[in-house]
């Protein structure tokens, strides 16, 4: 389980971890033993805490209720509950997601998805929150204009995994690269240009806040990055049955593309650059073994 694998890193960041489920103590105990889980698993077998947090999946009950044959209900079940159809055993489940809670019990951020099979990884959440990570499976490079380190948030993914390809960039002395908004003035914004994989979709790049650079010769004010920064290219593994079938025949997925940017110093704007990059992540299949409730 990915969360267990990141437990030590989370603790180093001063974070505690707990997971809550509608399952019984016995079911959670069986799961923890099989998967080597050492952090607290909280049994909310009447779903009272889940309901109090406002994340009770009401579609699960609709799927076995009087309107179970309604096409709209069946479509909702496939999206929010299970691709395998409704089942009374699923009633009481929460919408899957992550809450970040401070020491006073206040929710400071939350991460939830519409499609029940899509899940943010722990390290993806940490990157989104700006927490430092030690790059894994990193690709390092240097050009005349900048240094970069590119790495995936996770080295293994499964059906529906939402993860990121991170790019740490350090512009050279007196250099800057362009941030979103600079394209309006004809400059190339730094970013990834990933080839579309068969079993995943590519989300928009997430950029940090930029600064405004004044280029006196042209009397221009342009958004740029001059200090070290990180951009995130999010990738979401497809969660449908066909994607799962394809993944079952593969051991790994290689994502290929280019790092695109244009750099300038205080006097010269250099030609746009395109640097080939690739990332390989292992593929794992979901664990559907379940103890009886």
What residues fall within each predicted segment?
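Extracellular/lumen-exposed scaffold segments
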Residues: 126-293
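Short, solvent-exposed loop/turn and secondary-structure capping segments
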Residues: 30, 112, 179-181
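Structural microenvironment flanking redox-active thiols in thiol-disulfide oxidoreductases
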Residues: 1-52
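Thiol/selenol-based redox catalytic cores and closely related redox-interacting motifs
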Residues: 43-118
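C-terminal/domain-terminus segments
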Residues: 113-131
